[in-house]
């Protein structure tokens, strides 16, 4: 029986001092249920025994080999070297790969890592490792010298050992599929930091009043409007997060209400410290924050990939609006029938509205108006219209014509000025997209 394990261990130890873990790691895929430290320790003992045997059988070269490798092997070789060749044992340098830091970094990463997992209310985590370049290079050199081919990387060992020891403390588990956080271990520095995944909730909001913005809109004199985002701040407080972001499927004008179906959105809480708050509690906090002006429904947890789906979805989904429209000189039944015939099913050619030109590129969009149903109001030059339109059609401009930038328009068909004085979104099409997995 030849021993390629011993041969490659000797090749590595002839050139590099290696701690038990870093030697054992060269053979990580041999044997089961042992730590690399146990492997390294065992290989060192058997190697010393084998060299000792050869010396006892008169092999002069074996004694030279043993004496010269002893500093790299370490303490376990001391007694036999001193016995065979008194006074020739020398202390070796620190481990060529880990600098002797591996044990202590693993131990301290577990301490600090556990504290962080608890502080951020994490149950499912993964461990990542940031390796200094020098360590990776030393690891490659030693692997090359040993030529073993059954090893694993120091990164893999740190990840596994830290993960295993954290799990053994209880209350946490390694989860590669849906971790709540990643612990990053610096090696050999030993620092640990935590990347906490956001909380994501599928939800809906209703804006029951006008002049409410979707995003928080700060000015030196305080917020410009009350906002959907601001209404959600109690959720931020409840979860102990650092920041809250609303990913809504589109947005209505500040002065439009959002009624009916409500608008789908994903609420994101960044760096939360409390993750397991029941949806009903979050919803109650949000509704308290909405002060009766904004209502919320929290539906389920969401996945990160669904954020993009919600945002993409906004572009073309159907929406139903209620508009209160003032018409110069009043409106008759003949007018509303004329509007319906001219515009229902029509493709509206719309240049970017002049009111948003300062922040949006000037493009031409084509959006279909699926249906239009207007009723004149008694005793006033007003009509109430229910419109179903392709997402992205600007309704106020469809009414006014925006100086000819939107065609056709209510004003163009009627031959008189028309202005949308109230707008409500009453329904937003929503496929409830779900990310795979
Ligand atoms: Zn080492």
Curated annotation (Swiss-Prot):
Species of the source: Aeropyrum pernix (strain ATCC 700893 / DSM 11879 / JCM 9820 / NBRC 100138 / K1)
UniProt keyword annotations, A-Z: Isomerase, RNA-binding, tRNA processing
One Pfam match: Pus10_THUMP_arc
Stated role: Responsible for synthesis of pseudouridine from uracil-54 and uracil-55 in the psi GC loop of transfer RNAs.
Family assignment from sequence similarity: Belongs to the pseudouridine synthase Pus10 family.
Single GO MF annotation: tRNA pseudouridine(55) synthase activity
Protein name: tRNA pseudouridine synthase Pus10
Binding residue positions for substrate: 321, 394
The gene coding this protein: pus10
Active-site feature positions: 253
Keyword Methyltransferase in annotation: no
Any GO BP: tRNA pseudouridine synthesis
Reactions mediated catalytically: uridine(54) in tRNA = pseudouridine(54) in tRNA; uridine(55) in tRNA = pseudouridine(55) in tRNA
Domain of life from the UniProt record: Archaea
Transmembrane segments: none
Residues of the THUMP domain: 76-198
PANTHER family xrefs: TRNA PSEUDOURIDINE SYNTHASE PUS10 (PTHR21568:SF0)
Listed EC numbers: 5.4.99.25
Entry keyword annotation includes tRNA processing: yes
């Amino acid at each position: 029986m030849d021993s390629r394990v011993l041969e490659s261990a000797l090749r590595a130890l002839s050139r590099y001092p290696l701690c038990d873990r870093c030697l054992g790691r060269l053979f990580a895929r041999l044997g089961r249920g042992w730590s690399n430290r146990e492997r390294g320790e065992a290989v060192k003992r058997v190697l010393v025994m084998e060299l000792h045997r050869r010396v006892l059988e008169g092999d002069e070269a074996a004694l030279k080999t043993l004496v010269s490798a002893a500093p790299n092997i370490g303490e376990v070789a001391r007694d036999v070297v001193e016995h065979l060749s008194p006074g020739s044992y020398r202390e070796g340098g620190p481990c060529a790969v880990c600098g002797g830091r591996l044990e202590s970094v693993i131990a301290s990463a577990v301490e600090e890592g556990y504290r962080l997992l608890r502080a951020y209310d994490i149950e499912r985590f993964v461990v990542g490792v940031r390796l200094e370049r020098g360590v990776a290079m030393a690891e490659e050199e030693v692997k090359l010298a040993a030529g073993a081919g059954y090893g694993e990387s120091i990164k893999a060992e740190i990840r596994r050992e830290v993960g295993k020891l954290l799990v053994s403390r209880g209350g946490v588990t390694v989860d590669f599929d849906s971790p709540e956080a990643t612990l990053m271990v610096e090696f050999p520095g030993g620092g640990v930091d935590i990347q906490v995944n956001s909380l994501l909730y599928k939800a809906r909001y209703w804006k029951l009043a006008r002049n409410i913005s979707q995003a928080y809109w700060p000015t030196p004199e305080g917020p410009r409007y009350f906002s959907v985002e601001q209404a959600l701040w109690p959720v931020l407080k409840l979860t102990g997060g650092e920041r809250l972001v609303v990913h809504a499927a589109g947005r209505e004008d500040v002065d439009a209400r959002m009624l009916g179906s409500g608008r789908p959105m994903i609420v994101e809480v960044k760096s939360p410290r409390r993750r397991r708050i029941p949806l009903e509690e979050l919803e109650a906090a949000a509704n308290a924050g909405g002060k009766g002006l904004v209502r919320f429904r929290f539906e389920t947890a969401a996945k990160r990939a669904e954020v993009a789906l919600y945002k993409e979805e906004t572009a073309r989904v159907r929406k139903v609006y209620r508009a209160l429209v003032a018409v110069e000189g009043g409106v008759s039944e003949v007018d509303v029938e004329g509007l319906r015939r001219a515009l229902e099913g029509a493709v509206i050619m719309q240049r970017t509205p002049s009111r948003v030109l300062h922040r949006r590129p000037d493009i031409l969009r084509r959006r279909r108006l699926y249906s239009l149903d207007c009723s004149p109001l008694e005793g006033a030059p007003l009509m109430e219209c229910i419109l179903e339109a392709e997402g992205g059609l600007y309704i106020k401009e469809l009414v006014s014509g925006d100086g000819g930038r939107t065609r056709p328009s209510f004003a163009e068909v009627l031959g008189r000025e028309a202005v949308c004085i109230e707008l409500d979104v009453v329904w937003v099409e929503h496929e409830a997209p779900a990310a795979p997995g």
